[in-house]
């Protein structure tokens, strides 16, 4: 649903409340939740639904760090704040258990993210990470972890304007405590801790629509093991198709086809880093990495095996011409006697010099050169993911993905991912979708951020 549709829905909700003299008891549970979220976000420095942006920039000016409150925000008596030390076994284990048991599930409660300790080490400990930005809420009496939110440092660039920022992620509250209004207090507390470090902006994403997305992308799925996906209910058998036909449709070549494609090593970092930075400049919303961040996000380390996979293509002169990466984040399969886990690969960042000779990204020849090259690269990535026992490969409609999604048999998913900026007002950025939410191969996306 687009911003205008959600704005209209909220307007109807407000009118209903006015007719009933503000009596929320006449609202459904879902309507009450939507209204509470609306009330909270109305107090925050975020863009409003349908707001006309005349000048892009910060909503509130930076404050003095010494003016930020020193004390954490008060919790209900039975809870207490806890800074989570994920370098130690028990805190990492507690975060691991909380998210695996309570984080995002699909609507039918059939699949749930299966986070690994290695994934958390990669996602939560980039260069510059701070322990105090891993915020937990424990039950005072038992010590049980019941809520978590995190921030990691990043540098954002919005239409060429750079700002020190954080990426907010992994907001999770125990299922039985979701009526306790912990989410707003978690957001306020992580904001306080980040402000204490003289950072006033944040990037975050959500499947739900809040005030107000800067960009919206759609999830897409490319089956690698169609038979297993069908067995567990991830995909259905289309009308007028047989299982044999579906298996044939999604069969990939036995080995990668791009000449010279190989795993990226530390020796490739300089060339890949330069290529990546030049490629990213075409987008209106990006994260900029320094070289140590680039190494972390694309090579990982001994704490993060089997999480991030990066590949390069080097020409005969030793120049890196292509770079592509994906990460692994499996699903736990609930209520299925045959399968316990679904292997999932996620397209991360990539870059190619295929269209660098053209000033205009949308020049027809440049577009065709890039489309052909990306199609070859991502097809090989699907083969590599299949060989790593992944069952499906996911991508958003961000970046230049709309050029290859249809040709490579990525199907549109049910889910959309909305991107938000905290304390920054900007005009919407294309997310690779047409008005009717189809892949927009003509205009593509100007959204160049991939969030975990």
From Swiss-Prot:
Cellular localization per UniProt: Cytoplasm
GO MF entries: glycylpeptide N-tetradecanoyltransferase activity
Enzyme Commission number(s): 2.3.1.97
Active site positions, chain numbering: 452
Highest taxon in the source lineage: Eukaryota
Entry annotated with the keyword Acyltransferase: yes
GO BP terms: protein localization to membrane
Main location, first listed in the record: cytoplasm
Catalytic activities: N-terminal glycyl-[protein] + tetradecanoyl-CoA = N-tetradecanoylglycyl-[protein] + CoA + H(+)
Keywords: Acyltransferase, Cytoplasm, Transferase
GO annotations of cellular component type: cytosol
Matching Gene3D superfamilies: 3.40.630.30
Keyword Zinc: no
Pfam family, one: NMT
Annotated tetradecanoyl-CoA binding sites: 38-41, 171-173, 179-183
UniProt similarity note: Belongs to the NMT family.
Subunit structure: Monomer.
Job of this protein: Adds a myristoyl group to the N-terminal glycine residue of certain cellular proteins.
Designated name of the protein: Glycylpeptide N-tetradecanoyltransferase
Source species of the chain: Eremothecium gossypii (strain ATCC 10895 / CBS 109.51 / FGSC 9923 / NRRL Y-1056)
């Amino acid at each position: 649903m687009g911003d205008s549709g959600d704005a209209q829905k909220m307007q109807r909700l407000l009118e209903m409340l006015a007719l009933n003299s503000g009596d929320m008891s006449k609202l459904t549970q879902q309507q009450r939740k939507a209204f509470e979220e609306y009330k909270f976000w109305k107090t925050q420095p975020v863009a409003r639904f349908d707001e006309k942006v005349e000048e892009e920039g910060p909503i509130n000016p930076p404050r003095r760090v010494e003016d930020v409150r020193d004390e954490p925000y008060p919790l209900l008596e039975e809870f207490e704040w806890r800074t989570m030390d994920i370098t130690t076994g028990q805190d990492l284990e507690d975060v691991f258990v909380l998210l695996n048991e309570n984080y995002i599930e699909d609507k039918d409660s059939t699949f749930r993210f299966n986070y690994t300790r290695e994934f958390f080490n990669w996602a939560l400990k980039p260069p510059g990470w701070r322990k105090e930005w891993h915020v937990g809420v424990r039950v005072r009496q038992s010590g049980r972890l019941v809520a978590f939110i995190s921030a990691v440092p990043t540098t954002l660039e919005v239409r060429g304007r750079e700002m020190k920022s954080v990426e907010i992620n992994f907001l999770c509250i125990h299922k039985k405590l979701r009526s306790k209004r912990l989410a707003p207090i978690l957001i306020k507390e992580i904001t306080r801790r980040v402000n204490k470090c003289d950072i006033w902006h944040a990037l975050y994403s959500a499947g739900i629509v809040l005030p107000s997305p800067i960009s919206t992308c759609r999830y897409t799925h490319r089956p690698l093991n169609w038979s297993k996906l069908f067995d567990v209910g991830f995909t259905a058998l289309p009308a007028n198709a047989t299982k044999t036909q579906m298996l044939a449709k999604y069969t990939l070549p036995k080995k990668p086809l791009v000449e010279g494609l190989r795993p990226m090593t530390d020796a490739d970092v300089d060339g890949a880093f330069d290529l990546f930075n030049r490629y990213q400049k075409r987008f209106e919303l990006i994260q900029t990495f320094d070289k140590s961040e680039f190494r972390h996000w694309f090579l990982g380390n001994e704490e993060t095996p089997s999480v991030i996979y990066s590949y390069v293509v080097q020409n005969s002169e030793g120049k890196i011409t292509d770079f592509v990466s994906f990460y692994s984040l499996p699903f736990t399969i609930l209520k299925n006697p045959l399968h316990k886990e679904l292997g999932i690969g996620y397209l991360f960042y990539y870059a190619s010099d295929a269209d660098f000779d053209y000033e205009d990204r949308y020049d027809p020849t440049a577009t065709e050169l890039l489309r052909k090259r990306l199609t070859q690269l991502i097809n090989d990535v699907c083969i590599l993911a299949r060989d790593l026992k992944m069952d499906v490969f996911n991508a958003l409609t961000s970046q230049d993905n709309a050029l290859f999604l249809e040709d490579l048999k990525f199907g549109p998913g049910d889910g959309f991912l909305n991107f938000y900026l905290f304390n920054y007002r900007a005009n919407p950025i294309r997310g690779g979708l047409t008005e009717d939410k189809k892949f927009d191969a003509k205009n593509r996306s100007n959204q160049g951020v991939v969030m975990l």
